[in-house]
């Protein structure tokens, strides 16, 4: 059989003809340090701190008004610039004729916050046990850069006022949250809305803070937010060649092991995820596979047409399967038991691999890497040369070149047996279709989350796989 044109044209290295690099275009995510640098660039360009504060506070007021309408409001202001944003927000809400009160934790300390306090013409209460509740509470006590929990008395008053409010809004990040790690440094109430100033922060998409933010909206405050860390958005899928054939759409070759159910889920997901041809090497027939998935008793891992090799789901204690996979020059998705049998990350170098560990598998393979989850993910990818899909409630996708994708909040019902097998299959399909490794992993992560939303809370992994075509349709509709 003659090799496809795309193979011959790429110097004997198989890449489907639809292959093209896809830029990461999701919303940028800035750490506290990078946010300060972005603000400083704006200031160096002629903006003032007061102008940035005015834009942040005005945006906070606008978002709160759109969310809650003309609701009597209580703005809680801290001593720093986050408190200054609160003074500005209160002024803009009052200008709409909304009854507004301010309760301050302390007098402003920064010059910009003092300016914002001076622009407020109303009274300022002291935040205390006697502070009366309000239907709308806006939290501007502390923002990014917080490194310690709130004092107990402050935490108690924040909780009391939020518990009695109808609507709770946070400015930038909820007070008590460490913005870079998503860790709750002290008790954090559940907010209905969080208004991120200038850029998303890691905490907006990291466990456990993400679950306290409610809906997160992004406010433009006039800064240029550039980052290699971005929110994963709907994938830009490569167009199909009208004159192409199944190999142009990508061949996924999966290696079965002891537990056929897992590889069956992964292979089904790869087929439903758009791969043109899915093949499973198995020593015995696997029941329940779609008829379109080819079962073979030979492991043709060096077939030059393979767009992606999938190994790990259901592999069990058969390390020889992984050893065989690592002899192939094809791009790989390495999941589940295969991750455990890697033993050391050095085996990934030169493999063009995507690995998909959950927390336990990550620690067993990479050890105790220092830093927050994003830093650990990036370091693991750099050290191994593989794209790392660090799974969890806050799944991250890390590239060896330092790029990091944060999955948007996904349904909690994804925490179910077999959903990781489906994810591995979808990523393999995306890789076989020609997306580069990082983009393929991000695409698979987004599609899995969207499929879970479509499948609903009663889903099992089989339903998740069945929903992949609808998730693909949603991604395509967003491209138009």
Show which residues each predicted segment covers.
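Short amphipathic alpha-helices and their capping/turn segments at secondary-structure boundaries
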Residues: 123-132, 338-348
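Internal gly/pro-rich beta-alpha loop/helix module
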Residues: 136, 141-229
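A short, gly/pro- and small-residue-rich
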Residues: 152-168, 319-336
């Amino acid at each position: 059989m003659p090799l496809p044109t795309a193979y011959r044209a790429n110097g004997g290295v198989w890449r489907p003809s639809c292959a093209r690099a896809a830029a990461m275009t999701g919303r940028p995510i800035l750490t506290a340090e990078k946010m300060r640098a972005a603000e400083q660039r704006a200031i160096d360009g002629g903006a003032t701190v007061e102008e940035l504060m005015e834009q942040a506070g005005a945006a906070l007021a606008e978002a709160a008004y759109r969310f809650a309408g003309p609701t009597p409001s209580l703005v809680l202001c801290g001593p720093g610039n986050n408190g200054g944003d609160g003074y500005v927000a209160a002024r803009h809400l009052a200008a709409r004729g909304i009854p507004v009160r301010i309760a301050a934790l302390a007098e402003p300390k920064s010059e910009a916050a003092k300016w914002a306090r001076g622009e407020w013409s109303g009274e300022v209460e002291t935040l205390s046990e006697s502070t009366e509740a309000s239907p709308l509470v806006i939290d501007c006590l502390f923002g990014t850069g917080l490194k310690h929990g709130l004092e107990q008395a402050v935490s108690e008053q924040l909780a009391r006022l939020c518990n009695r409010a109808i609507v709770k809004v946070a400015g930038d990040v909820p007070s008590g949250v460490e913005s870079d790690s998503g860790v709750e440094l002290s008790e954090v109430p559940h907010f209905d809305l969080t208004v991120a100033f200038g850029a998303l922060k890691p905490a907006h998409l990291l466990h456990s803070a993400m679950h306290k933010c409610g809906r997160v909206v992004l406010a433009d405050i006039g800064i240029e937010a550039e980052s290699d860390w971005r929110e994963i958005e709907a994938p830009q899928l490569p167009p199909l060649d009208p004159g192409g054939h199944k190999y142009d759409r990508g061949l996924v070759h999966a290696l079965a092991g002891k537990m056929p159910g897992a590889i069956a889920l992964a292979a089904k997901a790869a087929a439903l995820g758009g791969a043109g041809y899915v093949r499973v090497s198995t020593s015995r027939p696997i029941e329940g596979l779609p008829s379109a998935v080819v079962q073979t008793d030979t492991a043709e891992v060096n077939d030059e047409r393979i767009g992606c090799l999938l190994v790990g789901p259901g592999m069990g204690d058969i390390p020889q399967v992984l050893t065989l996979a690592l002899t192939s020059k094809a791009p790989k998705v390495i999941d589940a038991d295969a991750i455990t049998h890697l033993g050391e990350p050095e085996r990934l170098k030169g493999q063009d691999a995507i690995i998909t560990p959950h927390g336990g598998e990550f620690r067993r393979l990479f050890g105790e890497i220092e830093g927050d989850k994003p830093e650990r993910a990036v370091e693991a990818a750099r050290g191994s040369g593989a794209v790392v899909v660090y799974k969890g409630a806050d799944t991250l996708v890390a590239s060896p070149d330092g790029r990091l994708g944060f999955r948007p909040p996904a349904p909690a019902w994804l925490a179910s047996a077999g959903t990781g097998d489906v994810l591995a299959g979808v990523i393999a399909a995306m890789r076989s279709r020609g997306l580069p490794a990082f983009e393929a992993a991000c695409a698979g992560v987004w599609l899995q989350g969207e499929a879970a939303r479509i499948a609903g809370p009663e889903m099992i992994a089989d339903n998740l796989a069945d929903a992949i075509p609808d998730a693909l349709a949603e991604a395509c509709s967003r491209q138009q």
